[in-house]
């Protein structure tokens, strides 16, 4: 692994830790972190009330860069991974699903975007 890749990995881990702390402080219960599935990895899985939330964390120099870094293909991959993760957990099947985004930018509080995308809704862009 190159030095640049190691640094990016370390920034990503730090951003995920910060996002976890932020979400727990807001009342979310963390269920999984860096959840690996056959379709790919989910940064965070949490529950709040009647919602099962799959959360992508993006750390970039600016909020615009963070928003631009998650495209339709990645949203589709996360949605597929979420279905795989949830399938064997029948105790969670009654919960509403939501796909959130946490943007981590240097010198700013994390920005939590609830319901950042809706699977299968091509008319609705990333909020």
UniProtKB/Swiss-Prot annotation:
Domain of life: Bacteria
Molecular-function GO terms, alphabetical: nucleic acid binding
InterPro entries per the UniProt record, alphabetical: Restrct_endonuc-II-like, tRNA_endonuc-like_dom_sf, UPF0102_YraN-like
Xref: HAMAP family: UPF0102
Similarity comment: Belongs to the UPF0102 family.
UniProt protein name: UPF0102 protein Mmar10_3014
């Amino acid at each position: 692994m190159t030095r640049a890749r190691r640094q990016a990995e370390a920034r990503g881990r730090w951003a995920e830790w910060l996002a976890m702390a932020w979400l727990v402080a807001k009342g979310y219960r963390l269920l999984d972190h860096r959840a690996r599935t056959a379709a790919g990895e989910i940064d965070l899985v949490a529950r709040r009330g009647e919602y099962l939330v799959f959360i992508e964390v993006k750390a970039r120099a600016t909020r615009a860069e963070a928003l631009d870094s998650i495209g339709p293909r990645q949203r589709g991959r996360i949605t597929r991974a979420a279905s795989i993760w949830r399938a064997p957990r029948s105790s969670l099947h009654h919960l509403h699903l939501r796909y959130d985004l946490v943007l981590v930018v240097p010198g700013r509080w994390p920005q939590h975007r609830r319901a950042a995308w809706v699977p299968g809704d091509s008319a609705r862009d990333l909020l």
